[in-house]
Amino acid sequence: MGQKTHPIGFRLGVIKDWPSKWYPPKKDYAKLLHEDLKIKNYIKKRYKVAGVSKVEIERIVDKVRIKIHTAKPAIVIGRRGQEVDRLKKTIERMLPGKEISISVLEVKVPELDAQLVAEDIALQIERRVSHRRAMKRAIDNALKAGQKGVKVQVKGRIGGAARARKEWFLVGRMPLQTLRADIDYGFATAYTKYGILSVKVWIYKGDVLKGGKEEILKKIEEEIKQAAKEG
């Protein structure tokens, strides 16, 4: 039976970075891991309507830096920064004795963020929109923005069927085993009266090389063609 690897975890340390950065003693590892999960789940739940894509946490001695990537930063920041100040005080109570700093970063194109796309499809399914329509719309939006490939999968008791099944659409390329391939991945859950449906989204954005993005490859190809013409 084939085993699936997580597209982001598979590329950590190669072209992807860790969402949590800290180096604790072995005895503190589990404690800090649970603290991170608690903070991330709390922020995602508190700002569900803000479209929070991911939360990054960095710890340096007694300082904790939190980066919130969201499609609607105004909701997280609040009027004159009041909301983000309230969030900071709440997290300070969760982590007593720590110096907390929070930065809010905008996701400029939510249609290209796999996590936000997955959550949007799940929300549409909960509102009884056809799953196929939601999936195809998400794929069309990503391809119009110039992405190389998109895959969307929905699994569960689709449409209230007696048996669970999965449906998926793939348009373009999706090189899952190529480490230099920049693949964004998102997962969401849709709660319906028939049960739970899982939604997974993969977006292939092109290849990443040590020197930069895939434009380097294009430049090399152009130089080779030019040299061939001159030769």
From Swiss-Prot:
Molecular function terms, GO-annotated: mRNA binding; rRNA binding; structural constituent of ribosome
UniProt-listed CDD domains: KH-II_30S_S3
All copies of domain KH type-2, residue ranges: 39-108
Keyword rRNA-binding found: yes
Gene Ontology, cellular component aspect: cytosolic small ribosomal subunit
Pfam families: KH_2, Ribosomal_S3_C
GO biological-process terms attached to the record: translation
Superkingdom in the source lineage: Bacteria
SMART domains: KH (SM00322)
Signal peptide: none
Keywords: Ribonucleoprotein, Ribosomal protein, RNA-binding, rRNA-binding
Family the UniProt entry places it in: Belongs to the universal ribosomal protein uS3 family.
Assembly information from the UniProt record: Part of the 30S ribosomal subunit. Forms a tight complex with proteins S10 and S14.
Record function comment: Binds the lower part of the 30S subunit head. Binds mRNA in the 70S ribosome, positioning it for translation.
Protein name (record): Small ribosomal subunit protein uS3
Organism: Aquifex pyrophilus
Lineage of the organism: Bacteria, Pseudomonadati, Aquificota, Aquificia, Aquificales
Gene name per UniProt: rpsC
